[in-house]
Amino acid sequence: MLAQSIRDCILWIRKTPDRALRAAKEAADLYQNIQQESRIYQNLRGANDATVILYLDKELSQYERTVKLRLQEFRVSSALLRGFEASQTESAETKKMVEEIEMAISRSQFLRSILSASSVKTHKPLAFEKTGIIPRSIPRTFDRLRRELLASSEDLVVQEFRISRYQTLTSLKFLASLIWIPWIVSWFLRVWWLEPTITMFWNQDQTQLFLHRSQEERALSDMRAFQEKVYFEVLVGEAPDPTPEVLQRRIQAKARDLAEASNQNSIESLANLGSDILACLILLAMLSLEKTKIAVLKSFLDELIYSLNDATKAFFLILVTDVFVGFHSTHGWEVILELLFAHFGFPESKKFIFMFVATFPVLLDTVFKYWIFRYLNHISPSTVAVYHNMNE
């Protein structure tokens, strides 16, 4: 059994060059397929979709890196295993395959040439185009009829479906990464670095027991509730009348428990603040580095939103406004602020909460109404009409 395992391991190691070369060949074939599909799509459309071009260029870059890494793996493993096997014929065939892969990657950098600043700057979302003398729907209708009457309209539909699939997959993956990567990284840093560091410095250098006045008031309130519970149990006969020494020990034990709980709560509050700051920094770094995927995600969300009918759009508008700026939204904002204060360990301020609830929803409602008047009227007047009718 051991000898067979050793032979299998040796065989797997000796096949590393072939395995790396096959992986490089597969990545090069996918690279060429994406290039061909994007070229056909551009010829049929007669125009460059900057978002699609950005995404396909990103895909080509990934496959190109895969090919280079696999070829490097092939060269290194071949150099280390040289002399084990491989005849001159096999070496010649392998060399020919490597040259074909390198030529396929270096040939025809199609998307790199059309991905320029001018093409990206001149591209604007369809829903935000400025209105002119002729309504936008008329030229769009003629353009749609022209493309449907072309002999290559079926190819256009297939290519648009593939491009849409690319766009949807990368949008969902990027959206999931924006949610999970900052949370996972910040959680890992909190557990293994931030919280132990805060615990060490807090327990060594901190002289005061409580982080702020509100925390002290909660501890005192819990202490009074414990004392009242003890006396109540004695009065109703659920517990025997304790001696002063026993009562003092119980009160001291409860005080130590409350002190330890308050100390741990202070450490967790500081750790929450630090980990959330780290998560925000990671999110900002991702947004600044992944501008290509942001453009793809924005295009995907635009298509998703504008594909809804007017009644559905109006329904979501009413839902959002009623939740955040509606009559009962003040209670929701109060709960959110109290949760944030407890999460970060900030002292609760009723005056600040009342002032925030009295001003922020009003400001948000004003901004929303201005957005409807300034932008939504030009983008989708029918949605605005349905929205007002549903509100009435």
UniProtKB/Swiss-Prot annotation:
The chain crosses the membrane at residues 174-194, 269-289, 316-336, 352-372. InterPro entries: CemA. Disulfide bonds: none annotated. One of its GO terms (cellular component) is chloroplast inner membrane. It is found in: Plastid, Chloroplast inner membrane. GO terms for molecular function: antiporter activity; proton transmembrane transporter activity. Keywords: Antiport, Chloroplast, Hydrogen ion transport, Ion transport, Membrane, Plastid, Plastid inner membrane, Potassium, Potassium transport, Transmembrane, Transmembrane helix, Transport. Contributes to K(+)/H(+) antiport activity by supporting proton efflux to control proton extrusion and homeostasis in chloroplasts in a light-dependent manner to modulate photosynthesis. Prevents excessive induction of non-photochemical quenching (NPQ) under continuous-light conditions. Indirectly promotes efficient inorganic carbon uptake into chloroplasts. PANTHER family: CHLOROPLAST ENVELOPE MEMBRANE PROTEIN, CHLOROPLAST ENVELOPE MEMBRANE PROTEIN-RELATED. This is Potassium/proton antiporter CemA. It comes from Nephroselmis olivacea. The gene is cemA.
